[in-house]
């Protein structure tokens, strides 16, 4: 498996997390990943958005340190870095997840 570069948890900033979560599509992605509690492909997370739009959202989520993406063949497997984020910023992500209303 090939892995995409992600920031170390020490480099993750709360302002970057909050910026990443300021978009409704990214909030939905994070909510779905949290609800699933497992790795999900981009196809499983289909939000009826163009592929380029989804790539953009995942790039921002990865840069903020919220999502980890592993490439396995042709699939991009995405997972939420919930435990790491909760350890660095206790309660922040849990509080945000409670506000997400999934369709």
Which residues fall in each region the model found?
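N-terminal helix-turn-helix DNA-binding core of bacterial DNA-binding proteins
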Residues: 16-50, 72-84
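N-terminal leader segment of winged-helix/HTH proteins
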Residues: 1-21, 66, 86, 97
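Canonical helix-turn-helix DNA-binding module
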Residues: 43-67
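Generic macromolecular interface patches on structured domains
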Residues: 39-40, 55, 95
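N-proximal short alpha-helices
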Residues: 2-3, 18, 27, 31-34, ...
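Conserved segment of winged-helix/HTH DNA-binding domains
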Residues: 13-14, 35, 77-103
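Intrinsically disordered, low-complexity regions enriched for glutamine and histidine
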Residues: 1, 54-55, 74
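Conserved acidic functional residues
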Residues: 23, 57, 90
